[in-house]
Curated annotation (Swiss-Prot):
Induction: Expressed in the late phase of the viral replicative cycle.
Pfam families, alphabetized: Phage_holin_3_1
InterPro entries: Phage_lambda_GpS_holin
Lineage: Viruses, Duplodnaviria, Heunggongvirae, Uroviricota, Caudoviricetes
Periplasmic compartment segments: 60-71
Organism: Salmonella phage P22
UniProt keyword Cell membrane present: no
Protein name: Antiholin
Transmembrane segments: 39-59, 72-92
Comment on protein domains: The C-terminus acts as a cytoplasmic regulatory region.
Length: 108
């Protein structure tokens, strides 16, 4: 009996997700380095970097959806890591408020 009969299927699945994984690693590294450089606490920096990696995992699909080249995924992943989840969240809130027609001066 083989030790790991599903090894080839596992390797195939890992190779299929290689591009997304590289983008996630780039975003994680950039967010972690940015957070530590700015003097952030280790735990907060690690959580922010993980959230950036999750967002960057799907950036290739978002670029294709937007009609842009998927070759921009690596630089977009680094950009995601650089701006961080706080900036991404505020951009999404601003976009949603504009679409909903909300004009509140107290929005950040």
């Amino acid at each position: 009996m083989k030790k790991m009969p599903e090894k080839h299927d596992l390797l195939t699945a890992m190779m299929a997700a290689k591009e997304q994984g590289i983008g996630a690693i780039l975003a994680f590294a950039m967010a972690y380095l940015r957070g530590r450089y700015n003097g952030g606490a280790f735990k907060k920096t690690l959580i922010d970097a993980t959230m950036c990696a999750i967002i960057a995992w799907f950036i290739r699909d978002l670029l294709v959806f937007a009609g842009l080249s998927s070759n921009l995924a690596y630089i977009a992943s680094v950009f995601i890591g650089y701006i961080g989840t706080d900036s991404i969240g505020s951009l999404i809130k601003r976009f949603a408020a504009k679409k909903a027609g909300v004009d509140d001066a107290n929005q950040q």
